[in-house]
């Protein structure tokens, strides 16, 4: 569960390292789960990269500590909250994705992120 003011790690190579959620997109949303789009501000960034500190970005959540329950009854949880920065057309801004990605992103039509990920859980 990601709420506003939550810090997330970035799982791509855009240059941002940490972001803070400021808004969850969608009708009447109070918290976000895997596959939801958020608006965030960059809190830590590597210098001279695509994304700078204090930039406002859109991101899709790819890992949460709370996890997600599948129809088979299995629950998937991760060690950290992580997101991938995306463009307005829902394609990733970076060219590489780091760490495992949940399979639920395919249902939300983030196929490009799935293809860049090294491991799909």
From Swiss-Prot:
Gene source species: Euglena gracilis
Keywords tagged on the record: Chloroplast, Plastid, Ribonucleoprotein, Ribosomal protein, RNA-binding, rRNA-binding
Cellular localization per UniProt: Plastid, Chloroplast
InterPro entries assigned to the protein according to its UniProt record, in alphabetical order: Ribosomal_uL14, Ribosomal_uL14_bac-type, Ribosomal_uL14_CS, Ribosomal_uL14_sf
Role played: Binds to 23S rRNA.
A GO term, aspect molecular function: structural constituent of ribosome
PROSITE patterns: RIBOSOMAL_L14
Stated family: Belongs to the universal ribosomal protein uL14 family.
Organism phylogeny: Eukaryota, Discoba, Euglenozoa, Euglenida, Spirocuta
Disulfide topology: none
Database matches in HAMAP family: Ribosomal_uL14
Quaternary structure and partners: Part of the 50S ribosomal subunit.
BP GO annotations: translation
Protein name as it appears in the record: Large ribosomal subunit protein uL14c
GO CC entries: chloroplast; cytosolic large ribosomal subunit
Pfam family, one: Ribosomal_L14
